[in-house]
């Protein structure tokens, strides 16, 4: 485990067993977001979060576009605790003998924020309070099959931030009129 409770981030590796179990995450509170990958297979990255509909029962795939999907073999339909997260018996992120990696995130006031929002289809958009000016933002629709978008304050250093990259494909940077982050 490599962790920093100050920044709310840990990197955890383990050897898969295909048995229901738990993995220590090294943070002092339950992670808000976990991104896990079997490093020895072509299986998709699994993303679990309190903010995905039916939290920890449904996952999203970082390298794919589907909406949140019911998958009990990833996190065993169980929310993380202050010390561990759960694994199901499937091969997706628990393949017997394979090395698995997980990136665990906690929201830290004034530093990082994991959350969700409901769009309002207005020109002004939805106001999302983070308590600070984010340097990096990920966006993924959990209800529909859309890409994962990221934007940052280096590509778009001023208001409005509308230059995006995709996390799930190799498209070049694009500028969107519908992505106007202040």
Labelled PLM ranges:
Residues 1-182:
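Surface-exposed molecular-recognition determinants
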